[in-house]
């Protein structure tokens, strides 16, 4: 006689997935070590997630966690209404927070969430002037990020304008919910054992990049669908992807999710 096993419902609630996401960002993404200070950069719309990240950072042993809030509407108001000739003025303290954290051996996590069409009607020269000014002042910090001198991480979260571009047939509320579902699925935050799954995934990426580095292929040849492209690879090239290490030995994953491995092509003259 057969029998039917009734299994418990393993579906996680939204709050459980969000806590998982924050835990992944801190434990797998940022790799916070005891005693580190942490800077969180977050849009005001993502306050719920940012607060969970703060708590997870303290749970991981952070000594001090600060948040730098961003507001798209405030930024838009400036680009629309500020006088001409004022866009080389910046709030240096916003960049100084990054530089200070890096110089203290700290970690920086940024929650990126913005409406891609936010500045669609704004004078592009105003935006370009502001961006050039900020980039110039951030250069010392950017150099540390690009060379993995500190552990850093980028994650994302839905905001209404962005979500509705992704799901145009849904209401604003439904679009945000659907974008959350997509983010949770892509980051494995919808799984109870999300951290363990990420550890296995990063191990797989490491095996793949080590294999490819050992092969030292001369070129990659892409064919199909009207494409016939050969890309030469640099001598003694190294494949990267997945987790990385700081000079101090802290392992971090700069982007969650991340699925690719990559390398450098040969420079042509």
Please name every model-derived segment.
Residues 9-265:
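Active-site bordering "gate/hinge" segments
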Residues 269:
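Conserved small/polar residues in nucleotide/adenosyl-binding loops
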